[in-house]
């Protein structure tokens, strides 16, 4: 089993990168807690910037 998380940080949402990374990781945590095994990652501005998933 493998957990993969990848997102692009080349936009204005990452001017304060640490805060945006924490926000994204909390969002991933919330989805894992409700049983999700994958999702698209969006930045604070609504742009699709990546994906995470659990693979067998």
Task: Locate predicted features.
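N-terminal acidic leader/helix
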Residues: 1-27
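Short, intrinsically disordered low-complexity segments
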Residues: 33-56
């Amino acid at each position: 089993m493998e957990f993969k998380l990848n997102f692009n940080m080349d936009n204005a949402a990452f001017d304060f990168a640490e805060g945006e990374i924490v926000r994204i990781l909390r969002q991933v945590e919330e989805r894992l807690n409700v049983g999700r095994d994958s999702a698209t990652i969006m930045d604070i501005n609504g742009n699709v910037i990546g994906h995470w998933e659990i693979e067998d």
